[in-house]
């Protein structure tokens, strides 16, 4: 199984929408990322997953009006430190999880209702 697109958004970055899966903060975005990726890696049929997307969407919206805080970086190319910290942790142990040497992350992010357009 290859997961082609997933994301988590929060409202603490100044953008008005979370996208498909809302969480409380940038740290929670990182926790959700780690939980999701490690669960996919631990699945016996898991091949990989692809985070969408690299940059936040512009506050005025893209062609269809979406303006979500779903990027690894803001629109000024600055990383979200709290999210990146969790991604680094996940990346450092993902192969051990995939190989069954380590259990996947069980910590879950604090979810909020989705805000999407």
For every predicted segment, state its role:
Residues 52-117:
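Aromatic-rich peripheral "rim/lid" segments of glycoside hydrolase catalytic domains that contact
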Residues 1-36, 52:
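Active-site clefts of carbohydrate-active enzymes
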Residues 7-8, 45, 62, 68:
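Generic hydrophobic/packing signal
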Residues 37-41:
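Non-transmembrane alpha-helical segments in soluble domains
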Residues 1, 42-48:
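Loop/turn elements at helix/coil->beta-strand transitions in domains of secreted/extracellular proteins
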